[in-house]
């Protein structure tokens, strides 16, 4: 038996199928080559890293003294930390030697326990020995806390620090928009080279 309501519902669908089959599809513009996307992303990371470094120098003048005594500087301009009970943090950064970017790195970490929300901060690591830089270079993912000795600088330490008495391999400054972050640490972070 013929049901006019079903037929009425099918007619528009059939008309759309016929119409779409006779229309020439306009080509979509090609995506730019991934290399130009990668170059733009790399340029942004480099610019953000130097901006973070300059921001640190402006808020903590002693940091510039550490830069003068460092063999390399690893800058993560934007680390995002988020979670609820189980959390994580991560971000990309660059390794700078003699004022030039010589490599890209990723930082990641997981954390457990009571936590809620998200925050963003920057981290700068001053490598004061060639051995520490070599350890970073040869590591297939550096678990921070294993290998080179590390000191995380807080506001009190930064004010009283002197580059004449550097005894650790790596000095870390963790900071946000309001300056150095107290109580921040690097245990559990893993730093891995990106690309070659």
Annotate the PLM regions:
Residues 1-11, 21:
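Bacterial N-terminal signal peptides that target proteins for export
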Residues 5, 12-13, 42-45:
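Generic alpha-helix initiation/capping and coil-helix boundary signal
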Residues 10-14, 67:
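Residue-level detector of transmembrane insertion/anchoring sites
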Residues 14-17, 39:
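Helix-centric, low-specificity signal for extended rod-like, repetitive segments
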Residues 16-25:
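C-terminal segment of classical bacterial N-terminal signal peptides
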Residues 26-196:
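Small-residue-enriched, tightly packed secondary-structure blocks
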């Amino acid at each position: 038996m013929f049901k006019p309501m079903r037929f009425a519902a099918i007619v528009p669908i059939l008309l759309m199928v016929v119409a779409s089959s006779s229309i020439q599809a306009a080509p979509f513009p090609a995506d730019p080559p991934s290399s130009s996307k990668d170059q733009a992303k790399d340029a942004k990371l480099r610019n953000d890293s130097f901006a973070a470094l300059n921001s640190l120098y402006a808020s903590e003048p002693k940091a510039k003294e550490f830069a003068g005594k460092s063999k390399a500087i690893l800058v993560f301009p934007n680390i995002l930390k988020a979670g609820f009970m189980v959390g994580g943090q991560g971000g990309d950064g660059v390794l700078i030697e003699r004022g030039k970017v010589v490599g890209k790195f990723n930082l990641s970490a997981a954390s457990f326990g009571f936590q809620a929300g998200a925050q963003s901060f920057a981290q700068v690591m001053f490598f004061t020995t060639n051995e520490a830089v070599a350890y970073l270079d040869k590591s297939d993912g550096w678990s921070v806390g294993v290998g080179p000795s590390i000191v995380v600088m807080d506001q009190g330490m930064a004010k009283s620090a002197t580059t004449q008495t550097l005894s650790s391999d790596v000095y870390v400054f963790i900071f946000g928009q309001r300056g150095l972050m107290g109580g921040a640490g690097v245990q559990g972070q893993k730093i891995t080279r990106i690309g070659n």
